[in-house]
Amino acid sequence: HLMTTDDFAIWQAKASDAHQGWISAQNFHAKPGKSIYFAAPDGRIDFAIGIFGNHAVWDGAALAASLPKGHWQFTAASDDLDAGLLESLALGWGLGQYQFHTYRSAAAPAVNYLTLPDGIHADRLIGQMGGIYLCRDLINQPPNHMTPAALQTAMETLAKTHDATLETHSGSILETEFPAIHIVGRAAEIAPRLMDLRWGKKGPKITLIGKGITFDSGGLDLKPSKAMEMIIN
């Protein structure tokens, strides 16, 4: 059950003696991102209460981390929990399950599953999480693996998956058309490149310009030593 701190205060005032005793024994204080669960007579979890506030994405992630591993479903304690808020909580829940296990030899830890509530745009939600997961995977790669060439391979895979187009510019064209990229990266062991990824033909045109920093910092010690150490770290 999803509640605000005010919802919880109202519910607690009407709760059974057993539930109130359990809340007291757990020293539970209703704060956004916190949760408490209650057991059925047979010892299994009967239900849980999760508290959310003004930062639904963060609260959703915190709830996913705090609850016992299993399959969960959101129910609202009041009509104030609209579809948009539910979607933000679900997004946070999904982002809280992220794991980077590319180099892991042992089995990945268990995760918490969520059955999406009615009214949520599942495709949009999964798309958002997929994009953030991809960025996290790229960032978490060790620097000797995530080179400009490796980033190009990742973008080629992304373009193929989503029927997008990718143009990659490298070599002499950078010297004449994109001199800043050429000057900074020309001494690097793995050559710099400019990637132009395009997707979709309908709707307004939106351009996002991203400066993809990989480990190659140009190959030239243009910064003070301490700053270069920070780049490496």
What are these regions (language model features)?
Residues 1-214, 222-230:
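N-terminal hydrophobic/helix-forming segments and targeting peptides
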Residues 217:
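Cofactor-binding active-site loop characterized by glycine-rich and histidine/acidic residues
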